[in-house]
Amino acid sequence: DPYGLGDSDLHFRVLDIPNFGNAVTSYYYNTIGGYSAVKMQRYQDLIDRYISSEIRQVFKATENAATVQEVAAALPELKVVSMLNGRYIILDGNISPVLNPNAYGNCWFVDSYIPAATPDEEIALLAHTDLRNTAVIGDDFAWAQDAIRHFENSSDCHFELVEKSPTIALTHYAPNELRYSFSTDTERAAIFSEIYYPKGWKAWIEPEGAYGEVRNGHYHPSGEGRPIELFRADWMLRGAMIPSGEGQLIMRFEPDSYQLGENISRASSIALILLLLGSAAGMILTGRREGKNA
């Protein structure tokens, strides 16, 4: 921890402006930026269209600031950096990182959505949408739009029955597994500051206090757990419909290719064992026959 952030949160990101294009800071923190030879095109589009612009806004707003406190006071609202949970901003390696008070956190509930008919419209809508309360969802996830629309219609009629604010929070973080606890009186849409990647990430809802088993690297829900679908929101983030009640959401990276490899490996092992057993049985029978003929 070269900057001594001392942050007890399970997961947040750092925007290191001087080292934005390399992996120096990524060794210590989760970062916005960094170098990757396999960077997703949608992420690169987000950098080109929004994050680069927000970095320029930071420089312009803080160019006359002489102290960390003045930098913090002058910091503009950074919508895309905030939705990516960019909690700290490094302007200069010689001064302390600046806290971004507007960071959305690891996850949040939204009350509504705006549909996007095309990818161009989807990324453009980020500039004009209150992303803290409204999600931008492409028409390729019409089922998620329908689910949120149903919630909107229900809340309009029964808002007075909602007695407490819904909550959702990250409780466990690992590169291949995330767990969130939630409490809500009605079904709601949650957005997560994680990259949507359909080829491997799977999700389950578990009742409060329940957790399935991880066997051979794969998550097996408890008897009461049920799988749910994830959707893409705000150009590249994950979204999920959270049912009413209390419980936990588990996301785990389990690509089908891994499962296929496991099955092939298991089948090969069984075949090898059967072959060895068959060979051993053959040797025993041959030995008995030779003994009788002796």
Predicted regions located by residue number:
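Extended recognition/assembly regions associated with phosphoester-bond processing machinery
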Residues: F59, V68, G86, G93-N94
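Conserved hydrophobic/aromatic beta-strand scaffold that supports enzyme active sites
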Residues: I95-P97, G239
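Residues that flank catalytic or metal-binding motifs in active/ligand-binding sites
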Residues: L10, N85, N94, N176, ...
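Active-site-proximal, structured, solvent-exposed surfaces of multi-pass membrane proteins
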Residues: L75, V81, A135-A294
